[in-house]
Amino acid sequence: MIRFFVILIITVSVKTVFAQNFNRGRIKQRNYFELISYQQIKGLPVVPVTIHGKTYNFLFDTGAMFAISDKLYRETNPPIIGYTGISGSSGDIRNMRIIRFPELFLQGITFINTRGVVLHEKSEFFDCLEIDGIIGSNMLRNSTVQIDNQSKHIIITNKLSSGKHEYQKMIFIDRQSRPYIYITMQKGEKKINQRVLFDSGMTNFFDLNFGTAIRNVDVVDIIAESEGILSLGIHGIHPKQKHLLLHIPEVVISNLTFKDVIITTANNSNSRIGAKLLEYGKVTLDFKKKRLYFNLFDNINTETVSENLYTFGITIQNDKPVVGIIWDKTLESEINFGDEVLSINGIDIQSWNLCQLLSFEFQPANDDHYVELRNINTGEIKKVALKCLHIKDYEQEYWKRSK
């Protein structure tokens, strides 16, 4: 899942809604230790995979099962062995083909008869990430995996010793071996333990389930509420939904404390820790022993964990860039959900497609910017400041407990 707080979120989360067992297939080699270089595309790890002598880009995603694009399916024609309902990150469900992929190579590792799914013909996040498939957790279930974001290397092995370092116990709750751990959210003396999925296919640090946030206001500060569009998933752009902007004073992962964590809520069943965790330290997943190790990099600041937040966000609707969500309530008298975005800082974006919009970066990230909008109701054109959202300026109580 890719987080763009200014623009949009891409959620690369794939799970079956029926009792399908995707822990099928194997690694050919008896003993293997591979040091694999990866590139970061929009903050996510992407690795080279070889199929029939041709190299393809695959997302390395612990929050998903093995999957390929419809284009790659048509090129390779693996056998279809069934169909299943697949849930995206917003909880929407669509029917997909289940395949048995005969052989693919991830450097010196050969995956044989891997079970996975074929995504739809029009898969916008595959197009924008320029990837052809997903290396999922079901392929890693008998291995130890180490992701080192500083060196941009992934180790996959069945003979790595993790030593006697502290670890988090991993839990598998589905038949695709997606790794869950428990973290702690704390505010003063009050704290709760929260089960989260470690999802390397999500760029931001932490997504908290919407209902969990509402139920735990003792440890979570709700600083803004809005209804809008934040996400693009495997089934396309998500529908308009209610979202919360949250402040969590402390989040503890593997005995390491992250302070002043600013996040938004997710509308699916899982809370998730994403790939931004990799910026802070080396993550090792021992799937066989069910252990997650996290080793903090030197000279890393964990005092403030926040994305670049702005007063409103932009999405795509009816093939046009539009206002997708408004966090600053004082702007609701000036702009509307669905107002067409004509330009950003004088750059005409009316003809931009989704991938161009996702590639746009504000420089520098914390400055104010100017957006030209066409009012969805009146057609009036006006220029509006898109400002950095300084949390202390907007913090307010949106929810009160009934006595």
Regions found by a protein language model. Name each.
Residues 1-24:
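Bacterial Sec-dependent N-terminal signal peptides
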Residues 18-403:
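Pepsin/retropepsin-fold aspartyl endopeptidases
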